[in-house]
From Swiss-Prot:
HAMAP family per the UniProt record, alphabetical: ClpS (MF_00302)
A Pfam family matched in the record: ClpS
Gene from which this protein is expressed: clpS
Organism for this UniProt entry: Leptospira borgpetersenii serovar Hardjo-bovis (strain JB197)
Protein name as catalogued: ATP-dependent Clp protease adapter protein ClpS
NCBIfam families to which the protein is assigned, alphabetical: PRK00033.1-5
Function in brief: Involved in the modulation of the specificity of the ClpAP-mediated ATP-dependent protein degradation.
GO biological process: protein catabolic process; proteolysis
Disulfide bonds: none
Family from the record: Belongs to the ClpS family.
Subunit annotation: Binds to the N-terminal domain of the chaperone ClpA.
């Protein structure tokens, strides 16, 4: 909890209020499978954008290939959004329809 002080200029009173701080939301970045993007390109994206090892990247790629989607990582809003944009730009530059999405992670 943090203290916030409010000053009322008309009455010249200082009021102390307790404010409960809330942790910022985290976002899951999900890679989506498609029938056109080569598996090796997906592995490269996971290594380059998400800094995963080759083995981790292959596991994530296979999960997306089998189930249709896979978790790439959990990040703050700004980082997650940046990673989604990076994937979309790189895929577009290479002529692939690869997509990522981001969704709010449920609080436990």
């Amino acid at each position: 909890m943090s203290d916030i002080f409010r000053f009322d200029t008309e009455e010249q009173t200082l009021t102390k209020e307790k404010v409960k701080l809330k942790r910022p939301s985290k976002y899951r970045v999900i890679i989506l499978n498609d029938d056109f993007t080569p598996m090796e390109f997906v592995v490269w994206i996971l290594q380059f954008v998400f800094h995963r090892s080759r083995a981790q990247s292959q596991q994530i790629m296979l999960k997306a290939h089998i189930t249709g989607k896979a978790l790439c990582g959990v990040y703050s809003h700004d980082v997650a959004r940046t990673k989604v944009i990076q994937v979309q730009q790189l895929a577009e530059q290479h002529g692939y329809p690869l997509h990522c999405t981001m969704e709010v992670e449920e609080e436990s």
